[in-house]
Amino acid sequence: MIVPLLYLALAGAYLLVVPVALMFYLKQRWYVVSSVERTFMYFLVFLFFPGLLVLSPFVNLRPRPRKIEV
């Protein structure tokens, strides 16, 4: 009984928890990273790609509209 729960917890972490944290990390650091950190970010995206793909329909990464004052 413990083995299926362990598999479920690991699958949930791999497909949901870590990709959500990774998306927040990428959104905060994308424009201010060094080249070494960017390589690490690419590695994390490659490693957690299935989870990012699962979450992609629910994420809006488009820039916010600008406020133009007249």
Swiss-Prot record:
Alphabetically, the GO molecular function entries are: oxidoreductase activity, acting on NAD(P)H, quinone or similar compound as acceptor; quinone binding
EC code: 7.1.1.-
Pull one GO CC term from this UniProt entry.
Answer: plasma membrane-derived thylakoid membrane
Membrane-crossing segments per the record: 2-22, 39-59
Q: Which residues form a coiled coil?
A: none
Q: What class of enzyme is it?
A: translocase
Q: Where in the cell is it found?
A: Cellular thylakoid membrane
Q: What does the record say about its membrane topology?
A: Multi-pass membrane protein
> Keywords for this entry?
Membrane, NAD, NADP, Plastoquinone, Quinone, Thylakoid, Translocase, Transmembrane, Transmembrane helix, Transport
Q: Which domain of life is it from?
A: Bacteria
Q: Which reaction(s) are listed as its catalytic activity?
A: a plastoquinone + NADH + (n+1) H(+)(in) = a plastoquinol + NAD(+) + n H(+)(out); a plastoquinone + NADPH + (n+1) H(+)(in) = a plastoquinol + NADP(+) + n H(+)(out)
Here the disulfide bonds are: none
Q: Which Pfam family, just one, is annotated for this protein?
A: NdhL
Q: Describe the subunit structure.
A: NDH-1 can be composed of about 15 different subunits; different subcomplexes with different compositions have been identified which probably have different functions.
The family annotation for this protein states: Belongs to the complex I NdhL subunit family.
The entry's function note states: NDH-1 shuttles electrons from an unknown electron donor, via FMN and iron-sulfur (Fe-S) centers, to quinones in the respiratory and/or the photosynthetic chain. The immediate electron acceptor for the enzyme in this species is believed to be plastoquinone. Couples the redox reaction to proton translocation, and thus conserves the redox energy in a proton gradient. Cyanobacterial NDH-1 also plays a role in inorganic carbon-concentration.
Indicate what this protein is called per its UniProt record. Answer: NAD(P)H-quinone oxidoreductase subunit L
Q: What organism does the UniProt record list as the source?
A: Trichormus variabilis (strain ATCC 29413 / PCC 7937)
